[in-house]
Swiss-Prot record:
It comes from Burkholderia multivorans (strain ATCC 17616 / 249). The gene is argS. It is an enzyme of class 6 (ligase). Its main location: cytoplasm. Its EC number is 6.1.1.19. GO terms for molecular function: arginine-tRNA ligase activity; ATP binding. This is Arginine--tRNA ligase.
């Protein structure tokens, strides 16, 4: 049911309920000044298709307040509903089920209306401007610039980019932000790792630093640094390798710039773009961390104990107070996070969403407590969080734990290339991997990583990603789109068909249960998008697309499209064209391509 139809039916049912309630309560209630307030009408699709198209339980909710039997009440509501002129073109029939469920069947014309809506609106179908004028900052990935992006970052990138698209579909202006943790212990470890490689050491050698990173990429950084190469991140200043093995600060700056560039390349391969990169180091250089700490001290939110500065996080629901500044004068890792979120608020983002790994769960209360303690108007519960669990990579039935690039973990680029069909070991020669392989891999990785709820662990099966059959969910959905393209191309060539003529097709020809079910699924797309945005649940789009592809395949297997009779042929072509458009729209939400041939 389309949103406009749903709103109309809800209004008709609400009016019917008021009529029945007034008749039951009579003038006594009115004379006593008792206003009857009906509950909000909730419409759902019945779990069993035979029960109709729409179900409502309002009679069971109101039976007790109105002092009547729920089934009898349902009969009165249905009688009032079907008597209304507005319902006669929308509702074909109504029946009472069980203790008082109202099951409605929509008219054929009401079901068919979705085809015209999709064909008229095209890529805009399903979107809304209900949140127009509102801004959202969505922070995701936010990796340390100490190595290539790993599969956990990949899950964040897929979830974040898809969620940004879904939220934007409701009218929000979405600002995508990447927070670079370019300050702290990890950056120091990166510098000494690169320095050790520049001196000719390798993992396992005497003198190799215990905290050093072992990936081969460190050797590449050291080589380019010693050779005087110049590197730059997309938003950064060029940094030239000094070639001085003793200048640790120069090594650090070069290594950070090198890895920021590499992460930019990872994100480009993944099809993810950001509006802004925010550097943690800038919070220190601009004095924002100190300013935030001073403000919390002045607000009475801190105390000294054992030589450390503590934040009263228990005031905001944390299980214990937390150290802000250690006895050696350094800050704990959540302190710059508080300062960073102050900048988000000061930049006018009253709605902020962070996508992070579930290992960050403990920082939520600390960051929120710090923000509340500043007393600058930030609401409780700011920011929102989407936490995701880990990803395990499997190939040939075995877990893959390391890669040639990173040494100790699987990178996003590994996953893209393997899922696109690159042979094991081919990542060592990336110039030999063509764009088609990257596209296939990117589509598979993005769809797979979005296809489960964020708070569930995910097993990424490389072998499944390579299958070209119904077991592979992204192939299943993309194949539905490609098959429709093929049928419509044949319809054009064989019958001189024009897509522009499809809105005039006689849709009354669509009489089969499979056609009705497919149209019903198409009509659910706008409400599904709204739900996905409200619940911060981009996986709902992946679930929907699999269901839509299934409905299409059921229809296609049950009915021939290219029949001799023009009227049913064009009606079925119109249904296919609408289905193709919604598949394309949904795949675009996930950042996945909609191929015309496979």
């Amino acid at each position: 049911m389309l949103p406009a139809q749903k709103q109309t039916l809800e209004a008709l049912l609400a009016d019917s309920v008021q009529q029945v309630a007034h008749a039951l309560k009579g003038a006594d209630a009115a004379n006593a000044g008792v206003a009857f307030v009906a509950p909000a009408i909730t419409l759902e699709r019945p779990k069993v298709a035979a029960h109709g198209d729409v179900a409502c339980n309002v009679a069971m909710q109101l039976a007790k307040p109105l002092g009547t039997n729920p089934r009898q009440l349902a009969e009165k509501i249905v009688a009032a509903l079907t008597a209304q002129p507005g319902a006669q073109g929308l509702v074909e029939s109504a029946e009472i089920a069980g203790p008082g469920f109202i099951n409605l069947r929509l008219s054929a014309a009401a079901k068919q209306a979705v085809i015209g809506a999709v064909l008229a609106q095209g890529r805009a179908f399903g979107t809304s401007d209900r949140e127009k004028g509102k801004r959202v900052l969505l922070e995701f990935v936010s990796a340390n610039p100490t190595g290539p992006l790993h599969v956990g970052h990949g899950r964040q990138a897929a979830l974040g980019d898809a969620l940004a698209n879904v939220i934007a579909s409701q009218g929000y202006a979405v600002h995508r932000e990447f927070y670079y943790n370019d300050a702290g212990v990890q950056i120091g470890n990166l510098a000494i790792s690169t320095q050790a490689r520049a001196r000719g050491l390798k993992p396992g050698d005497a003198g190799w630093p215990e905290a050093a990173y072992n990936g081969e990429y460190i050797a590449d950084i050291a080589r380019d640094y010693m050779n005087g190469e110049t590197v730059a991140a997309k938003d950064g200043e060029p940094v030239k390798g000094a070639g001085d093995v003793d200048d640790l600060d120069a090594i650090r700056k070069f290594a950070v710039a090198y890895l920021r560039r590499e992460q930019d390349m990872d994100l480009q391969a993944f099809g993810v773009k950001f509006d802004q990169y925010y550097l943690e180091s800038s919070l220190y250089s601009e004095g924002r961390v100190e300013k935030t700490v001073d403000a919390l001290i002045k607000a009475g939110m801190t105390y000294e104990q054992d030589g450390a500065l503590w934040l009263r996080t228990t005031d905001e629901g944390d299980d214990k107070d937390r150290v802000m500044r250690k006895s050696d004068g350094t800050y704990t890792y959540f302190v710059p996070d508080v300062a960073y979120h102050v900048t988000k608020w000061e930049r006018g983002f009253t709605k902020v969403i962070n996508i992070q790994g579930s290992d960050h769960h403990g920082t939520i209360a600390r960051v929120r407590a710090g923000l509340q303690g500043l007393h600058i108007g930030i609401p409780k519960g700011y920011p929102d969080y989407v936490l995701h669990k880990m990803v395990t990579v499997m190939r040939d039935g075995q877990e893959v734990k390391i890669s040639k690039r990173a040494g100790s973990y699987v990178t996003v680029r590994d996953l893209i290339e393997w899922s696109g069909g690159a042979a094991p070991g081919q990542e060592a020669a990336p110039d030999l991997i063509d764009e088609a392989t990257i596209t296939r891999g990117r589509d598979a990785v993005r769809f797979f990583l979005i296809s489960r709820k964020a708070d569930t662990e995910f097993v990424f099966d490389i072998d499944l990603a390579l299958k070209q059959n119904d077991e592979n969910p992204v192939y299943y959905v993309q194949y539905a789109h490609a098959r429709i393209c093929s049928v419509l191309n044949e319809w054009k060539s064989r019958y001189n068909g024009e897509l522009a003529q499809l809105p005039q097709a006689d849709l009354s020809q669509l009489t089969s249960p499979q056609a009705a079910s497919l149209m019903q699924k198409l009509a659910e797309y706008p409400d599904m998008l709204t739900h996905a945005a409200n619940e911060l649940a981009p996986h709902a789009v992946a679930f929907y697309l699999r269901d839509l592809a299934g409905e299409f395949h059921s229809f296609y297997n049950a009915e021939r499209v290219l029949v001799d009779d023009e009227a049913p042929r064009n009606a079925r072509a119109a249904l296919l064209a609408a289905t193709r458009q919604v598949l394309e729209n949904g795949l675009a939400m996930l950042g996945v391509s909609a191929p015309e041939k496979m």
